[in-house]
Swiss-Prot record:
HAMAP family xrefs: 3MGH
InterPro entries per the UniProt record, alphabetical: Formyl_transferase-like_C_sf, MPG, MPG_sf
4Fe-4S listed as a keyword: no
Lineage: Bacteria, Pseudomonadati, Pseudomonadota, Alphaproteobacteria, Hyphomicrobiales
Leading EC class: hydrolase
Family: Belongs to the DNA glycosylase MPG family.
SUPFAM superfamilies: FMT C-terminal domain-like
Domain of life: Bacteria
E.C. number(s) listed in UniProt: 3.2.2.-
Name of the protein: Putative 3-methyladenine DNA glycosylase
Length: 208
């Protein structure tokens, strides 16, 4: 499957060709995991798509939830890699992160956007709209489309209902500053698939 090809929601879902990612994949530096996730496939109960945009966060910088230390809300970030960290943003939208690095490192990758490939009818029902480009183009949108909530917090990424599959072809990854933050706003820790129409926001340096 070409990462930038247009897909239709008619007919059966395409097969997932990549191998499931193990917890060892997420045990690496968050700055290696984040770009390597571009082109991977995220499914929750069989609904999801290709990851096209992410952001990296680490406890050493003030934009991270873990910067001030562990709390009941962010405790999952301080645990072992390969687990989901789910929180509510502005009291409205759920956001899903993948915990990375060694136990106690408090690093995670925020999943910002997907290219829908699986369970698109279910996504449309949950989102209340038809346009595929808008179904998962943002962290809150994709959580609504995939049915992700606090019930998924602290769940492993390598066991049902969550599955993450390795990309099967090289991805053309671009980088830029993160979105919607005021601290450490100059760090180029946002990564995306160049040319994707499913991004939450274009990359200024990407020329499109």
């Amino acid at each position: 499957m070409k990462l930038t090809q247009d897909l239709t929601s008619d007919g059966p879902d395409p097969p997932v060709l990549g191998k499931p990612l193990t917890r060892a994949f997420f045990g690496r530096s968050v700055h290696d995991v984040a770009p390597d996730l571009i082109g991977a496939t995220l499914l929750v109960d069989g609904v999801g798509g290709i990851i096209v945009e992410v952001e990296a966060y680490h406890h050493t910088e003030p934009a991270a939830h873990s910067h001030r230390g562990p709390t009941p809300r962010n405790m999952v970030m301080f645990g072992p890699p390969g687990f989901a960290y789910v929180y509510r943003s502005y009291g409205i939208h759920w956001c899903v992160n993948f915990v990375c690095e060694m136990d106690g490192s408090a690093a995670a990758v925020l999943i910002r956007a997907l290219q829908p490939t699986h369970g698109i009818p279910a996504m449309r029902r949950r989102r209340g709209l038809h346009e595929e480009r808008l179904l998962c183009s943002g962290p809150g949108r994709l959580c609504q489309a995939l049915g992700i909530s606090i019930a998924h917090n602290a769940l492993p990424l390598d066991a049902p209902p969550i599955a993450v599959f390795r990309r099967t072809e090289k991805a053309d990854v671009v980088a830029g500053v993160r979105i919607g933050i005021t601290k450490a706003a100059d760090l180029p820790w946002r990564y995306g698939l160049k040319g994707s129409k499913f991004l939450s926001k274009p990359f200024r340096s990407a020329g499109y």
